[in-house]
């Protein structure tokens, strides 16, 4: 490797933001298109990284360690982003949404705060072994909110090989 410019180090080191709440710069007033888009929603990153160690997941390894955003910061960002965009859906995004420690509080806030607007809550990347039925039933009560569960393997042997940590009974 020969750098194209002087002053560029030969070895590039990974940079890591340890406090993702302090360094949070959400796009609070994004450009909203005039047409209906498929992903017509606000996306709120609730945490970065993953506590799981699934052997197939590159993102789980790259974004380590797991870092959660402060729930109060997320509440303020959600309020501002939904008001600024007029979207009727918010996606709580992370590699494993159900592992966020303040998920119940955040979902309850969103339901209470935007009850009159019937804002949908989308929870992608849920783990079968980590979701709470009470939270999920509240999400489903609002409107057409969506839940996306992470795929599991077809056999116990394969689940063991890829380090899913689930049994047939769990599923």
What is each model feature region?
Residues 1-17, 66, 70, 87, ...:
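Terminal amphipathic helices with adjacent charged low-complexity linkers/tails
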Residues 2-3, 9-13, 53-56, 101, ...:
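Short helix/loop capping segments that flank catalytic or ligand/cofactor-binding pockets
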Residues 79-171:
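Conserved SAM/AdoMet-binding glycine-rich loop
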Residues 1-43:
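N-terminal [4Fe-4S]-dependent radical SAM core
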Residues 31-55, 82, 145:
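N-terminal pre-triad scaffold of radical SAM enzymes
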Residues 50, 54, 74, 123, ...:
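Conserved, mostly hydrophobic/aromatic
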Residues 57-73:
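Iron-sulfur (Fe-S) cluster-binding segments and ferredoxin-like electron-carrier domains
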Residues 33, 56-62, 153-159:
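Gly-rich Lys/Arg/Thr-decorated short loops/hinges at beta-loop-alpha junctions or inter-strand turns
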């Amino acid at each position: 490797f020969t750098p194209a410019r002087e002053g560029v180090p030969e070895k590039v080191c990974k940079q890591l933001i340890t406090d993702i709440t302090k360094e949070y710069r959400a796009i609070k007033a994004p450009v909203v298109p005039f047409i209906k888009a498929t992903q017509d929603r606000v996306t709120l990153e609730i945490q970065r990284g993953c506590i799981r160690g699934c052997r197939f997941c590159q993102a789980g390894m790259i974004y380590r360690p797991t870092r959660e955003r402060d729930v109060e910061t997320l509440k303020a960002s959600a309020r501002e982003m939904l008001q600024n965009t007029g979207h009727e859906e918010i996606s709580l995004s992370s590699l494993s949404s159900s592992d966020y420690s303040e998920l119940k509080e955040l979902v309850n806030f969103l339901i209470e705060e935007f009850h009159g607007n019937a804002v949908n809550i989308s929870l992608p990347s849920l783990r079968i072994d980590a979701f709470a039925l009470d939270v999920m039933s509240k999400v489903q009560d609002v409107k057409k909110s969506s839940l996306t569960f992470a795929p599991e393997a077809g056999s116990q042997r394969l689940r063991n090989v890829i380090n899913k940590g689930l049994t047939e009974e769990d599923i």
